[in-house]
Amino acid sequence: DKDNLINRTLFGDGVFAGERVAYDDFVLEGGSIESDGRGTVLTTSVCLMAPNRNQPLSQAEVEKVLKERLCARKIVWFDHGQLIGDDTDGHIDTIVRLCPDNTLLYVGCDDENDPQYADLHALEQQLKAATDADGKPYRLLRLPMPDALYDDGDRLPATYANFLIING
């Protein structure tokens, strides 16, 4: 609710141009998608299809909403990469980030003993097969997985991918 409040306040103050459109029937937090601004949106199925978000919509219906409301031509769904301790149900911005020149930064794991190793390896395979809305493959840059961090014995979903990008 506070996320929406800041948007309404900024719009009311004239910071955003155009008409305010409210979509109260669809849950889409900021970190749940990445967009290149050229028609491609990245997301994870575990996040947008979580029971606490857009049920009872099917994945095809969610994709249709994203394409219509975000003017996207292609939605790239990743089925892997949810981190232990992640309370966002797998926001894309903790594991994969879009960068200029059709580049994706992504979290990799080299420790075969890490419980996240297999899932992050499967994510890497999906990334290698992914293309943008124009059918171009991505240039991939792998970020290391930081050493495990714990809070009261619970693993935290720490990565180097979850950062703020400011353009301009």
Model-derived segments and their meaning:
Residues D1-G168:
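The feature marks the mature, well-folded catalytic cores of soluble enzymes
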